[in-house]
């Protein structure tokens, strides 16, 4: 090799090492595997199963350790004690949102999911209060979910017991509920705009669940120069936002400040009252991104969980039989399920909790960030450091759930068959960044599943032992495999 080339390469390598060396400002971060210049620990992580990689690292470095995704350090919390201590005991310090450049580019730092600082605090405060005003957790929203459950039954009956992929039909129900909250109306399941919205949400979730997507978040410099699914992600997000912008403009033209109809109206009224509020930023763009966040979150969480539930209920028909027996005893065949029934249905309630625990829908949640220099255990974590919370390690903790890799509603039942709560149940994360839609999702899962099982027998196309229940895993979500079943009216 040419000596000059060798010299240039050597100097380049030394420069990288110089740039990479830990600086005094990084504090005493937890231990972790040695990172490589530029790549960090990226090459040591299985991007197709980040959960397992994190579990393996925890066996060597303990419940608190550091990984480098590219050049940026990320403190990883593994196990209930570490996650609970950070998100609840040190809730304010760990309430920041970690940098995720692909999402930030799409949301422009607005909305509720990926905003930070005062913008996030004001947006969350407004969102929680508005959802409460619209009846979240009350009979008002319950009626909407019950009505949609009846529409869902009607749509499922149209399959006439023939094999079908439930992905689309099941996704329509929670999507319509969130539509009724955001802009007051539901859609027919054949509506063209509705079909487009559902398709964009499905494609959006599929893209963010790919290993390639994680690469662009770790190496944001690639965003503007390399082709990839990050551009398709932006396209689907923009398509959803564009439709919701149209709805916002319709609301602006018909707004009655004395009679708010839905979430959009509440925002527009608040904009009139607090014009100039720099923390909330009451702009049309902020509203569009906020309702897009709510729309995607309100659709995908329940939709994916419902599909997983159907798959697991086919895999374990003896569990389905027990649930349907309880439905028959408590509700019967001639009235709609309601939330008051849940307290009298411990096995059904336990089954739904076990679905959420077992599928581990958001393995690591979304990245957190410490909002100030933080002393945590024996470590000093500088302000702005990203924090990854392994929700998998909590939901699959053997200490709390004796057979964590088995689907067993008994994990949430005591020795007398009564429903048993667990502090380890964190499918929606915990603390100040906990999902604002947890109550709605829980209501939808109970009412949709009990209504389906009240009206149909689930028939698999194969022997239960041959049903594949392995999810497609990524850092952000778990997606059920494609499957078909028959809804047989009873």
From Swiss-Prot:
Membrane topology label: Peripheral membrane protein
Which EC class does it fall in?
A: oxidoreductase
Q: Which gene encodes it?
A: Cyp2c12
Specify the protein name. Cytochrome P450 2C12, female-specific
Major subcellular location class? endoplasmic reticulum
Binding residue positions for heme? 435
This chain's function reads: This P450 is active in 15-beta-hydroxylation of steroid sulfates.
What CDD domains does the entry give?
CYP2C-like
Family of this protein: Belongs to the cytochrome P450 family.
- Heme found in the keyword field: yes
UniProt entry tagged with the keyword Cell inner membrane: no
CC cofactor: heme
Q: Which cystines does this chain contain? A: none
């Amino acid at each position: 090799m040419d000596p000059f080339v060798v010299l240039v390469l050597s100097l380049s390598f030394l420069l990288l090492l110089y740039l990479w060396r830990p600086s005094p400002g990084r504090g005493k971060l937890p231990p972790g595997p040695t990172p490589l210049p530029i790549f960090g620990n990226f090459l040591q992580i299985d991007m197709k199963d980040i959960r397992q990689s994190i579990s393996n690292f925890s066996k060597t470095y303990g419940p608190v350790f550091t990984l480098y995704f590219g050049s940026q350090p990320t403190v990883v919390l593994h196990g209930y004690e570490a996650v609970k201590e950070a998100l609840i005991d040190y809730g304010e310090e760990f309430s920041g949102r970690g940098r995720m450049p692909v999402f930030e580019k799409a949301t422009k730092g607005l909305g509720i999911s990926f905003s930070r600082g005062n913008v996030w605090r004001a947006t969350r405060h407004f969102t929680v209060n508005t959802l409460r005003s619209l009846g979240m957790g009350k009979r008002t929203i319950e009626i909407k979910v019950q009505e949609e459950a009846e529409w869902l039954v009607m749509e499922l009956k149209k399959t006439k017991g023939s094999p079908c992929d439930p992905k689309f039909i099941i996704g329509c129900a929670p999507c319509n509920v969130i539509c009724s909250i955001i802009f007051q109306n539901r859609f027919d399941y054949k509506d063209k705009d509705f079909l487009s919205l559902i398709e964009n949400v499905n494609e959006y979730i599929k893209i963010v669940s790919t290993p390639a997507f994680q690469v662009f978040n770790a190496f944001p410099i690639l965003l503007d120069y390399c082709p990839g699914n990050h551009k398709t992600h932006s396209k689907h997000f923009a398509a959803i936002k564009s439709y919701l912008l149209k709805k916002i403009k319709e609301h602006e033209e018909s707004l009655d400040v004395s009679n708010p109809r839905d979430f959009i109206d509440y925002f527009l009224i608040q904009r009139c009252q607090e014009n100039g509020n720099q923390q909330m930023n009451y702009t049309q763009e902020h509203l569009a991104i906020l309702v897009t966040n709510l729309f995607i979150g309100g659709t995908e969480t329940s939709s994916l969980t419902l599909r997983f539930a159907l798959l697991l209920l086919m895999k374990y028909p003896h569990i389905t039989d027990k649930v349907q027996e309880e439905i028959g005893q408590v509700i019967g065949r001639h009235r709609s399920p309601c939330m008051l029934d849940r307290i009298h249905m411990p096995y059904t309630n336990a089954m739904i909790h076990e679905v959420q625990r077992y599928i581990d829908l958001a393995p690591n949640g979304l990245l957190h960030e410490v909002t100030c220099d933080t002393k945590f255990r024996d470590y000093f974590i500088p302000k702005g450091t990203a924090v990854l919370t392994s929700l998998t390690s909590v939901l699959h903790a053997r200490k709390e759930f004796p057979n964590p890799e088995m689907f067993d509603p008994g994990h949430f039942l005591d020795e007398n068959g009564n429903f048993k709560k667990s502090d380890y149940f964190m499918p929606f994360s915990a603390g100040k960044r906990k999902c604002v839609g947890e109550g709605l999702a829980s209501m939808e899962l109970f009412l949709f599943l009990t209504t389906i099982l009240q009206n149909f027998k689930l028939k698999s196309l194969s022997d239960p032992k041959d049903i594949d229940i392995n999810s497609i895993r990524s850092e952000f979500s778990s997606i059920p495999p494609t499957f078909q079943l028959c809804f047989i009216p009873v």
